[in-house]
């Protein structure tokens, strides 16, 4: 007798990335339907102490996976306290109320912690796991217990 119940195999196959060595990596994250590429140029300034290490332009795609697994991470992390798939910066189309009580659609950045072992911090505060947390210009992100700080800015803020 045939079994037409969902097996989950198709969903697992769409979340799997094949590596060059023949192994595969199961992604912890799927983009939501409201995912959009940003209309303004967002940047992440990476600092260790007072020294700027690099500048990352993060407006070319709608989501950036952050983690230690270099085969899937868009923004690789080196620190051992960071998870292989630690967090995602996701741009989402959301409704925002204007000063007249109406609403308009805007694209905003959010961060979501992918149930990492040592957490994600925004402006020194730990954020909840598996939930979108809205980011604003000048927010400071930290991953795990790493000392590196990632400062988020966009073209209208310098």
Where are these regions (language model features)?
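Intrinsically disordered, low-complexity acidic Ser/Thr-rich regulatory segments
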Residues: 1-80, 93-99, 154-158
């Amino acid at each position: 007798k045939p079994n037409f119940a969902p097996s989950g195999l198709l969903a697992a196959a769409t979340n799997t990335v094949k590596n060059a060595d023949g192994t595969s990596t199961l992604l912890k994250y799927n983009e939501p339907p409201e995912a959009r590429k940003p209309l303004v140029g967002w940047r992440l300034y990476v600092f260790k102490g007072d020294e700027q290490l690099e500048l990352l332009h993060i407006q070319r795609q709608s989501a950036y996976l952050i983690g230690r697994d270099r085969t899937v991470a868009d923004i690789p992390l080196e620190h051992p306290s960071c998870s292989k798939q630690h967090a995602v910066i996701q741009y989402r189309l959301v409704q925002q109320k204007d000063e007249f009580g109406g609403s308009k659609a805007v694209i905003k950045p959010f961060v979501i912690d992918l149930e990492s072992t040592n957490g994600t911090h925004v402006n020194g505060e730990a954020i909840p796991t598996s939930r979108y947390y809205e980011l604003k210009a000048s927010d400071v992100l930290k991953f795990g217990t790493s000392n590196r700080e990632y400062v988020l800015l966009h073209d209208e803020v310098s």
